[in-house]
Amino acid sequence: MKRQLATTFAVAFLAATTPGLAQNSVKDALAKHWKTTGEFTIAVADAMPADSYNFRPNPEEMSFGQLMAHIAMADVGACAVASGLTRPELPPKLAEWAKSSGKAEVSKEAAMPFLKDTFDFCDKAVVAMTPERLDTVEGPPARNMTGFEWLWAYFTHTAHHRGQAEVYLRLKGIKPPDYRF
């Protein structure tokens, strides 16, 4: 009888705690990979010389600097929506870029600190997320997603544009940093 009672309690305990454990492991994985993607993206951004931040493969493409600003702007917004934390203010040079609908050039001097601040903010945002926040639907009607979906969507958005940035580097004859995961 004692063994049956102990088994019943053990099964009940596991059933009650497993979803939380699963959500924590998802959150831990998100935190780990957001940190890595931030470090890798910053390394890619740093590999481009300052005098080539206005380089674009063709006139329709964003310049390298605009691409870095786009990554940071999108990520800071997504991490704020996902976590509920207040997004940091844009530095003046990046606010100017945003007001120009992304048409103004962005220097390495302006882009690098913003990228670093963005990934610091996203690291804090992911760590601050509760299991409930990961499952809460947030955002404008056209982009109603759970906190998890916001983080995952913009993690992949970062990878997409970082891949573009690596092509820009290669077109300039620069070997991109080795892949990190």
Give the residues covered by each predicted segment:
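Bacterial N-terminal signal peptides that target proteins for export
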Residues: 1-9
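Bacterial N-terminal signal peptides
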Residues: 8-17
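Sec/Tat signal peptide C-region and signal peptidase I cleavage site
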Residues: 18-23
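Short, low-complexity N-terminal intrinsically disordered segments enriched in polar/charged residues
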Residues: 24-31
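Short, contiguous alpha-helical
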Residues: 31-35, 39-42, 52-97, 139-181
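Well-ordered alpha-helical scaffold segments within catalytic/enzyme domains
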Residues: 40, 44-45, 79, 121, ...
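Acidic/histidine-rich alpha-helical segments that form the ligand environment
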Residues: 99-138, 146-157
